[in-house]
UniProtKB/Swiss-Prot annotation:
Entry-linked InterPro entries: 6-hairpin_glycosidase_sf, 6hp_glycosidase-like_sf, Glyco_hydro_9, Glyco_hydro_9_Asp/Glu_AS, Glyco_hydro_9_His_AS
Protein name according to UniProt: Endoglucanase 4
Stored PANTHER family: ENDO-1,4-BETA-GLUCANASE
Annotated catalysed reactions: Endohydrolysis of (1->4)-beta-D-glucosidic linkages in cellulose, lichenin and cereal beta-D-glucans
One cellular component (GO) term of this entry: extracellular region
UniProt keyword annotations, A-Z: Carbohydrate metabolism, Cell wall biogenesis/degradation, Cellulose degradation, Glycosidase, Hydrolase, Polysaccharide degradation, Secreted, Signal
Stretch forming the signal peptide: 1-22
GO biological process, one term: cell wall organization
Active site, UniProt feature: 77 (nucleophile), 418, 469, 478
GO MF terms held by the record: cellulase activity
Factors inducing expression: By auxin in roots.
Amino acid sequence: MSRACLLLVVAAVCLAGREAAAFNYADALDKAILFFEAQRSGKLPPGQRVAWRADSGLSDGSADGVDLAGGYYDAGDNVKFGLPMAFTVTMLSWSVIEFGDMMPARRSSFLGGIFGGGGVAQLDNARAAVRWGADYLLKAATATPDTLYVQVADPYQDHRCWERPEDMDTPRSVYKVTPQSPGSDVAGETAAALAAASIVFRVSDPSYSAKLLDAAQLVFDFADKYRGSYSDSLSSVVCPFYCSHSYHDELLWAASWLHLASPEKKDVYLSYIGSNGHALGAEQDDFTFSWDDKRVATKGFLQSRADGLQLYKAHTDNYICSLVPGANGFQSQYTPGGLLFKEGDSNMQYVTSTAFLLLTYAKYLSSSAATVSCGSTAVSPSTLISLAKKQVDYILGANPAGMSYMVGFGARYPRHVHHRGASMPSVRDHPARIGCDEGFRYLHSPEPDRNLLAGAVVGGPDAGDAFADGRDNYAQAEPSTYTNAPLVGALAFFAGAHKIFTP
């Protein structure tokens, strides 16, 4: 983010409201990033900060003769699902790309040093979170020619047990997509993740960045050449958990990231988007952004970075209008307490992704001195920022329940998270194995979590702002990496803006 653009965006924050920040966004950002260390699979590094975790899944991939150790567990179980993991890496990368300058790596002289955080290594830790996922995706994409490994473990077998990752003895089956069993959706998202991550490391580690970009281009070519959905090829193990509604959006999403990541080939990917956009559904309005649907994000991403895409801007504006209460085109649902509500299972994933898009679009509008036309109403960047702030603040505690939905943040937060590792004694404190069936007593226990899953954002309350803090209540009490990933960017924005305008 350029200095001039940053000042324009932060000026919009001031217009949105001059009151002091209600929350310590920098602390929330630290915790949101820390959560990813609790989700790590594989050989943990010396600098691992979540001390109650230990090595796990070290032989992952051996069932197919490849090394698939590493990566992230997506939520509260011990499965490594490729589609949500790749989306997580894409969104973590986008958070760093868009708002990394607002994450202090060390005391900065930028704008007079006002980003100083006492040496808080937020940017370094965010990059580490990106790299942990990107390393795994790189292995999954390059281990075998014309093959992308997309999942480790049968979720049905995994869910028959309640085990710590360090103890798991359920089959670590390996699943892949190939020319004969295609998966353009998961391959497209993997290409997007690798391309986005390559931008993150372009300056700090050029050789690694180049390796990621090369792999991204290969995986995209594979996804485009062998078209088909992994929900068809691997339906028995990816559905109903992470069924993909279509692979069309992932192909355009991946091409968009490759357009940004490949300066020497940007015209090639832009031409692909122009030639394939109609067939891949780019001319349809859409109102949701998630691990399964990237259409609105792709349009917003592209129209702010490429010329000649006026239709994409119109669709993005329609999406924005759908979110703004009172605007022409408004069609979203909010709880009585003001939380965006899409659906009952893990609703917070839509809240965080929406808040992120609102802020990135506000940044674009500010830099262009533009607004969104919702009928006769001109919606300003400050309105988008204010709306995003309300969503973030709701998560952190400004809600009817007066509780934070981020574990470890504030005085009141969920204490019974649907998460195996958090609910059971740490392997550090209880080295003896806890078996498959034995673990269920921790799932059903009324006792609070044994280990603090700091930074985890749970699924959240229902349409009436009600929340049941129960470990059995996976729809409301389970966290996920793809909920936290876009929140990292949103929190970085508000942490940085707060530092600028607080005396």
